[in-house]
């Protein structure tokens, strides 16, 4: 009798679990999909996950494992290689695009796809600035892009970046204790972008800002929960401190406008202060500060991580390391005896290093997709993308797709011997909102690797350290090691 009663309880429990499980898995479908009416029939394959959380649990589980690409591979295994899937990601109904063709379509089509960001990103980077009209965005983009692009701009920065790299490498080599290589690379990159944005400012101020950016980055893709203990709470506090610092710098710069001594130390901040629209209206301080926050963030993360990973990959592949070194040695041999330091023309001759950098950026793609939003009901590959849904350009899905890049987990610079298929390499996005600092990022990596490969080596404290993928791919110890000088300049 007691045994039958236990079986009854177990059956009720299992039945309740199955019914509840099935009900909860359908809530998002009912809420977001059913309201679309006839359009729901032409939605791409996929599922909407759990209420509120959507598919974030399976996403986080994949990126906390040793196989972060399992998230996209699972979509392909379950629903086929459609290149477009419905989901619920980052707390919104979403369309995930994962092939070169679908990603390129979304990135290039400014008429049907606008900028889209999670609420946390809008709060932390500035709602008003992210919501600017297309025309206003184009005007400001031109203003903030000019300091980063073109041979004239890049030539101006070669010597400055070179000085920072040489000084810091020498400083690291002189340290008795191991350094946290990734953290030091971030400081290096932040010094560079700080010079471009401010023209000149104190090292202490840049160090403070770099510390605040660490918390800001962690909160960008977190749920907008402003409660102590959550990443967004810390990030919001960091933003407030950044805004205060930048407001002080802005006020000081406004006092310096037109002063002769200041003209040699101009940065992006001065261009933004002086900018006017067709009616002579200047930018509000709030917009200027938001633009500074965005450009400082974008200007140091990518170059720091890519520089670290390029060095690690080369040391893991001695034959590639030797080939990269020989290329740099040849550049020195061709250099006139009267020339001091690198030139942009020499950097353009680094063909093999260019492939190393491209392969590094492919192999270590961030987990964060590129966010867009459908402006109108539109069609991709015969599937409906509903107006207002966010569209996630899954760059890592493209970069780690074995049908696009054979043996994608292998580090193989030779895969770039041939021209890449359009849309198959998108570390900086594409279309109207392509990252304006792409050329500067690569310039920093070239200069760092040139000096590092010729004159230094890295001895890792934990050479078999596992890789962590959240919030960015990195050795779980953040690459602790000693930088050792092996040759004098």
UniProtKB/Swiss-Prot annotation:
Q: Which gene encodes it?
A: CYP88A108
Reactions listed under catalytic activity: melianol + reduced [NADPH--hemoprotein reductase] + O2 = 7,8-epoxymelianol + oxidized [NADPH--hemoprotein reductase] + H2O + H(+)
Arranged from A to Z, the UniProt key words for this protein are:
Heme, Iron, Membrane, Metal-binding, Oxidoreductase, Transmembrane, Transmembrane helix
Transmembrane residue ranges: 3-23
Record's PANTHER family? CYTOCHROME P450 26, CYTOCHROME P450 88D6
* GO terms for MF: ent-kaurenoic acid monooxygenase activity; heme binding; iron ion binding
State which tissues express it.
Mainly expressed in petioles.
Membrane topology category: Single-pass membrane protein
What name does the UniProt record give this protein? 7,8-epoxymelianol synthase CYP88A108
Regarding protein family, the annotation reads:
Belongs to the cytochrome P450 family.
| GO terms classed as biological process | brassinosteroid biosynthetic process; brassinosteroid homeostasis; sterol metabolic process
Q: Please list the cofactors this protein needs.
A: heme
Gene3D superfamilies this protein is in? Cytochrome P450
């Amino acid at each position: 009798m007691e045994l039958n009663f236990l079986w009854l309880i177990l059956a009720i429990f299992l039945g309740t679990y199955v019914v509840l499980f099935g009900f909860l898995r359908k809530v998002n479908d009912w809420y977001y999909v059913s309201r679309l009416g006839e359009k729901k029939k032409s939605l791409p394959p996929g599922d909407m996950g759990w209420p509120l959380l959507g598919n974030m649990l399976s996403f986080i589980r994949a990126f906390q494992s040793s196989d972060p690409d399992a998230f996209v591979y699972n979509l392909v295994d379950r629903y086929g290689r459609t290149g477009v899937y419905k989901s619920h990601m980052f707390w919104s109904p979403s369309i995930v695009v994962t092939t070169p063709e679908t990603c390129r379509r979304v990135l290039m089509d400014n008429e049907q796809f606008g900028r889209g960001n999670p609420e946390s990103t809008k709060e932390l980077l500035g709602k008003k600035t992210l919501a600017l009209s297309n025309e206003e965005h184009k005007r400001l983009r031109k203003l903030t892009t000019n300091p980063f692009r073109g041979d004239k701009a890049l030539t101006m920065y070669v010597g400055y970046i070179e000085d920072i790299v040489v000084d810091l490498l020498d400083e690291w080599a002189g340290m008795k204790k191991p350094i946290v290589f990734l953290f030091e690379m971030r400081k290096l990159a932040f010094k560079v972008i700080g010079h471009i944005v401010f023209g000149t400012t104190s090292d202490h101020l840049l160090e403070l800002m770099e510390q605040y950016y660490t918390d800001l980055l962690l909160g960008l893709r977190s749920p907008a929960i402003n409660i102590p203990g959550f990443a967004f709470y810390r990030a919001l506090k960091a933003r407030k401190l950044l805004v205060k610092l930048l407001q002080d710098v802005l006020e000081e710069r406004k006092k310096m406008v037109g002063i002769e001594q200041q003209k040699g130390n101009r940065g992006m901040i001065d261009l933004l202060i002086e900018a006017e629209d067709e009616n002579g209206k200047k930018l509000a301080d709030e917009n200027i500060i938001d633009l500074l926050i965005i450009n400082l963030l974008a200007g140091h993360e990518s170059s720091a991580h890519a520089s670290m990973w390029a060095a690690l990959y080369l040391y893991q592949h001695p034959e590639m390391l030797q080939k990269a070194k020989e290329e740099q040695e040849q550049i020195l041999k061709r250099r006139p005896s009267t020339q001091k330091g690198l030139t942009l023309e020499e950097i353009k001759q680094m063909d093999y290093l260019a492939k190393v950098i491209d392969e590094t950026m492919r192999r270590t793609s961030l987990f964060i997709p590129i966010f867009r939003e459908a402006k109108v009901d539109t069609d991709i590959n015969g599937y409906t993308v509903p107006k207002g849904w966010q569209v996630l350009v899954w760059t890592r899905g493209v970069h780690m797709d074995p049908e696009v890049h054979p043996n994608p987990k292998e580090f193989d610079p030779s895969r770039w011997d041939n021209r890449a298929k359009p849309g198959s390499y998108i570390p900086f996005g594409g279309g109207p909102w392509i990252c304006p600092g792409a050329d500067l990022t690569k310039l920093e990596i070239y200069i760092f690797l040139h000096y590092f490969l010729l004159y230094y080596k890295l001895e890792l404290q934990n050479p078999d350290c596992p890789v962590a993928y959240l919030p960015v791919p990195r050795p779980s110890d953040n690459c602790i090691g000693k930088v050792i000088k092996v040759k004098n300049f």
